[in-house]
C-alpha cells in the first residue's frame, strides 16, 4: 500500500498486522477505529455509509485510487500512445487516399488545359474559312434564314417564316367536246363538205363551252310519205330476188338509235348511187318522222358535236 495511506481518526500508518477499510463517503479507517464507531455510520462525518476492506482482491477501480502518480502516468501514457498510434495510422491512410485523388485530378486538369489550347489554336487557324462559309450560307436561296445548331428553340421559332398564301391550285379544265364536225348545207343535190376540228384547234373558255353546248343540234328527222301499194309484178320480182340486205338487217337487229345528220346524208348518197335507184321515199318507212317546220335546216351551218 502507498506510504501516504493512514487512518483518518488515529493517523496510524498501515503495517502487516493491521487492516484498513474504505467508506463510501471517502474516509479510511483502521480496524480498531472501525470497531469503535457505529455500524453503517461514518465516525468523522456521521453520515450513513458502507465500508469496503482494502486488499489485493479489491475491485480494480477502487485500487486505482491507491496507485502512485508516476505509475498511473506511465500506465495511461502507454494507453494514450497506443490510442494515438492507432488513430495516426488510419489518418495516414486517409491522407494518402486524398493525395492520390488530388494527383489524378491535377493530371486530368493538365490534359484538359492542353486540349483547350489545341482547340483554340485550331479555331484561330480555321476562323477565316469558317467566316467565309458562314457568310455564304447565312441566307438560303428560298429566303429562309440559316440557323446555327447551337441556337435555342425560341430563337428558331421566332425566326421561322410563315407563308400564309394558300397553295396554288391547278387550273380546272372545262369539260368540252373532243371533236367538232361542221357540215355545210347540201348544194345542187350534193352533200356539203365536212370540217372536223380536234381539241388542239380549240381554245374554249367556260363561256364558249356553254355556247357550244347550247348550239348542239338534235338529230334531223326526214319527212316521209306513205307508200302506195306496189303492183303485183314488182312484188313477184322482189320475191324471186329475195329481200334487200339493208331491210332484212334492219328488221333482224335491235331497235336503232336516232340517226344523225351525217348518217342521213351518207344514206341519201348511198341510195342515190345504188343501181336499183332506191330513193328516199322507199327508205322512209324505216326513218323517223320529221316535223314539217324545220328551222334548223334554214341555218347556213349545222354543228354536230361528237364526244
UniProtKB/Swiss-Prot annotation:
Disruption phenotype: Both male and female mice are sterile. Males do not make sperm and have much smaller testes, a characteristic of mutants with meiotic defects. Testes show an absence of post-anaphase I cells, indicating loss of spermatocytes at this stage (stage XII seminiferous tubules). In females, ovary size is similar to that of wild-type animals, and high numbers of oocytes are present in mature animals. Complete synapsis is achieved but crossover complexes are absent. CDD domains: RING-HC_RNF212. Signal peptide: none annotated. It holds the Pfam family zf-RING_5. One of its GO terms (biological process) is protein sumoylation. It is found in: Nucleus; Chromosome. Residues 164-291 are annotated as: Disordered. Gene3D superfamilies: Zinc/RING finger domain, C3HC4 (zinc finger). It comes from the Eukaryota. Keywords: Chromosome, Coiled coil, Meiosis, Metal-binding, Nucleus, Transferase, Ubl conjugation pathway, Zinc, Zinc-finger. Specifically expressed in meiocytes of the gonads. One of its GO terms (cellular component) is synaptonemal complex. Pathway: Protein modification; protein sumoylation. Its main location: nucleus. The keyword Zinc applies. Residues 91-124 form a coiled coil. Its EC number is 2.3.2.-. GO terms for molecular function: SUMO transferase activity; zinc ion binding. This is Probable E3 SUMO-protein ligase RNF212. The gene is Rnf212.
